């Protein structure tokens, strides 16, 4: 029996057969082979199973397709390209999952001298690598030391002037309240400017941002040391704080460039020694140099620290931002498939409107139109799964360590394995796919309509870049619409502001009768609370993780509220005790050691609370933890700046006893927020769609 003739060679070649599904584009494979890929955990493996099964379904169906007449002649070229690209992405996933979790699993490739990136890159003694994770461990930890030392400067500048406030008042012929403005405005700069430095580093690279910012830091420190009046001092302190804030934002990104997630914990701990040592050393060294050479010596000391950092960065810090990114290759594949989206929809419609009787299997039997739809539907499913692969790869590879840029880092336990986080992340992936498809479709139409108007395109590009660099970093404020975020940040900010009430009161009260301590001794008064900061950061971090793990063992999942337990109760009890001890003993001029008991207790309590709230914030914003921490830093630095502005007038007006009794009451009342979150956190997560806020970032 003779069979009906097949489609023309052109059409037959366009049909997706079994061989095509196993092939990937040569160029993509080469990119994958030269890129470093690391395992993404069990989520990625779950995602990998479905595309493979779908491929088999597609192959079985498409092997049967033959037709009797060329009445349906759709252009299947885009479908074939999409099939190849998706197969390439699946092959990439297999390599991703099969890699051993080490950051040196691929042979290193040094960048030629002339192709190095960043300012003055040719004079760096350490060569740039295609992928910074290929550096030997000795080089990696040298870079960690450099950025840790550089990160000391910003927090150091917040407290270095505190022992010398009276000297500044006398030298610049001003008053204590005005000098406190220079301290508060510096804090404000530390909170605001990191939003932009981080954006700049992604656009221009880490090295260039470090070099520009520390060049400015050196210059503004010299200017501050030479300030002729209080107005110049305040203006220069704003610029000084803003330039020093770069490493607070970019340092975490550098750690992420150098280490895969499995290796970042130890590096993160070493890196954070710098920001933590700053507030501890600043009052001691500041008091010593101001006692010997006056308050201007504190700014020369800052200049020396920043200049040393600049030298280390210039000669020993190569660009670490990755040059070849496998994830970007995968994104390009998905963008390519989206560009063909309208053509694929046309093919789908053509199949839907075709005469089903004209389509036969290999035995000449008609194939229902639903099977043709299944072919196209399977491709759509594979595309969706491939997008999920890209999402998980990007999250695992690019998400840097989450840190609190002023206070000690508390161990962060990723909650992607909890049922809640899986549900949240899946919703986020779906929303992002829908948004990306819409944006790409609009972009394609816009490009087609304006391809003859280059001037408009250039102007539009400039406006887009300016918006992304200047305005978009402020979008993180939108997260304050999410109740858990605004509640936890409000309490964290109040607790942080209270720290500066203590710090400013120490320098004010101990410099007066009957104590009359010198600048050197004033600096030593900050040791008790600094020591308890270290203690609480160690104890609180382990306590935090123990609470989380105990809840997970009992209930089978990780929830953010499990971090808010007896650690918070201890802090709530210590807060009013510390405030009352310090406030009333310093008011009645008790023996100088007694008020320091209050500062030590407060330091321990505040670190327990701040550590727990920061980790709760990160866990409540899966995939956006860094954005949440930056927002938290912004709000609390604003409140800390306000505290430095008003503390001295309040001490003179109502006295330390009444002031710190009020602070104790505010802390006690605001701590009810944490108890409320403990009870209602799950309700907020279930009834408020944080994904809508993510889409606006």
UniProtKB/Swiss-Prot annotation:
Main location: membrane
Positions of glycan attachment: 175, 180, 516
Disordered: annotated span: 38-109, 338-367
Disrupted gene: phenotype observed: Leads to defects in biofilm architecture and attenuated virulence.
Keywords: Cell membrane, Glycoprotein, Membrane, Transmembrane, Transmembrane helix, Transport, Virulence
Record's note on what induces expression: Expression is repressed by HAP43.
Stretches assigned to the Cytoplasmic side: 1-141, 202-215, 262-268, 318-485, 541-565, 612-626, 675-697
Location in the cell: Cell membrane
Its membrane topology: Multi-pass membrane protein
GO biological process: amino acid export across plasma membrane; ascospore wall assembly; intracellular polyamine homeostasis; lipid homeostasis; membrane raft assembly; transmembrane transport
Single Gene Ontology MF annotation: polyamine transmembrane transporter activity
Ranges of compositional bias, category Low complexity: 53-69, 85-99
GO cellular component term, pick one: plasma membrane
InterPro entries: MFS, MFS_dom, MFS_trans_sf
Pfam family, one: MFS_1
Extracellular side: 163-180, 237-240, 290-296, 507-519, 587-590, 648-653
Membrane-crossing residue ranges in chain numbering: 142-162, 181-201, 216-236, 241-261, 269-289, 297-317, 486-506, 520-540, 566-586, 591-611, 627-647, 654-674
Entry function: MFS antiporter that does not display functional linkage as drug transporter and performs functions that significantly affect biofilm development and virulence. No substrate for transport has been identified yet, but plays an important role in the growth in the host.
PANTHER family given in the database record: MAJOR FACILITATOR SUPERFAMILY (PTHR23502), QUINIDINE RESISTANCE PROTEIN 3 (PTHR23502:SF5)
Membership in a protein family: Belongs to the major facilitator superfamily. CAR1 family.
Protein name, per record: MFS antiporter QDR3
């Amino acid at each position: 029996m003779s069979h009906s003739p097949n489609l023309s060679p052109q059409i037959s070649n366009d049909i997706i057969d079994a061989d095509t599904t196993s092939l990937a584009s040569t160029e993509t494979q080469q990119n994958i082979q030269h890129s470093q890929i690391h395992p993404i955990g069990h989520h990625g493996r779950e995602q990998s199973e479905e595309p493979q099964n779908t491929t088999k379904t597609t192959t079985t169906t498409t092997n049967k397709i033959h037709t009797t007449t060329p009445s349906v002649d759709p252009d299947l070229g885009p479908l074939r390209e999409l099939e190849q690209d998706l197969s390439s992405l699946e092959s990439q996933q297999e390599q991703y999952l099969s890699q051993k979790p080490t950051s040196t699993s691929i042979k290193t490739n040094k960048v030629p001298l002339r192709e190095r990136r960043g300012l003055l890159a040719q004079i760096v003694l350490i060569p740039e690598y295609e992928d910074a994770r290929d550096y030997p461990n000795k080089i990696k930890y040298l870079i960690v030391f450099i950025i840790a030392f550089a990160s000391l400067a910003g927090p150091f500048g917040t407290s270095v002037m505190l022992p010398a406030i009276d000297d500044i008042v006398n030298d610049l012929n001003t008053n204590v309240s005005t000098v406190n403005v220079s301290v508060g405005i510096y804090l404000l700069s530390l909170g605001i400017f990191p939003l932009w430095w981080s954006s700049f580093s992604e656009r221009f690279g880490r090295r260039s941002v470090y070099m520009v910012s520390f060049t400015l830091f050196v210059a503004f420190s010299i200017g501050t040391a030479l300030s002729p009046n209080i107005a110049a001092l305040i203006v220069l302190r704003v610029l000084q704080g803003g330039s020093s804030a770069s490493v607070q934002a970019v340092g975490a990104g550098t750690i992420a460039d150098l280490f895969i997630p499995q290796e970042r914990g130890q590096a993160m701990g070493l890196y954070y020694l710098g920001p933590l040592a700053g507030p501890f050393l600043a009052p001691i060294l500041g008091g010593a140099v101001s006692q010997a050479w006056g308050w201007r010596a504190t700014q020369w000391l800052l200049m020396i620290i920043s200049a040393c950092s600049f030298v280390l960065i210039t000669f020993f810090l190569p660009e670490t931002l990755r040059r070849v990114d496998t994830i970007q290759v995968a994104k390009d594949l998905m963008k390519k498939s989206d560009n063909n989206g309208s053509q694929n929809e046309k093919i789908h419609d053509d199949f839907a409107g075709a005469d089903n009787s004209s389509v036969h299997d290999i035995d000449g039997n008609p194939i229902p139109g639903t099977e043709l739809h299944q072919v196209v539907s399977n491709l759509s499913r594979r595309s969706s799964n491939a997008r999920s692969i890209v999402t998980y790869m990007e999250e695992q590879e690019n998400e840097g360590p989450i840190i609190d840029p002023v206070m000690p880092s508390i161990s962060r336990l990723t909650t992607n394995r909890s049922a809640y986080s899986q549900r949240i992340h899946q919703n986020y992936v779906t929303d992002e796919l829908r948004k990306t498809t819409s944006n790409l479709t609009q972009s394609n139409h816009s490009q087609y309509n304006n391809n003859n108007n280059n001037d408009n395109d250039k102007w539009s590009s400039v406006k887009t870049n300016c918006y992304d660099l200047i305005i978009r970093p402020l979008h993180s404020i939108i997260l304050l619409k999410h109740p858990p975020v605004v509640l936890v940040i409000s309490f964290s900010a109040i607790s942080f502001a209270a720290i500066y009430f203590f710090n400013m009161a120490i320098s004010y009260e101990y410099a007066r009768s009957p104590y009359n301590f010198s600048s050197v001794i004033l600096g030593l008064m900050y040791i008790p609370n600094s020591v308890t900061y270290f203690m609480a950061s160690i104890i609180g971090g382990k306590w935090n993780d123990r609470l989380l793990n105990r809840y997970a063992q009992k209930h089978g999942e990780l929830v953010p509220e499990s971090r808010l337990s007896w650690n918070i109760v201890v802090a709530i009890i210590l807060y009013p005790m510390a405030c009352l001890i310090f406030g009333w003993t310093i008011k009645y001029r008790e023996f100088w050691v007694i008020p320091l008991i209050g500062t030590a207790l407060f330091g321990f309590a505040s670190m327990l609370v701040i550590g727990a709230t920061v980790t709760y914030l990160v866990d409540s914003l899966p995939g956006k933890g860094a954005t949440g921490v930056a927002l938290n830093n912004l709000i609390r630095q604003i409140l800390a700046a306000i505290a430095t502005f008003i503390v001295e007038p309040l001490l003179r007006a109502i006295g330390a006893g009444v002031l710190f009794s009020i602070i104790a009451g505010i802390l006690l009342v605001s701590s009810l927020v944490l108890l409320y979150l403990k009870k209602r956190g799950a309700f907020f997560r279930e009834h408020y769609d944080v994904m809508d806020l993510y889409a606006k970032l």
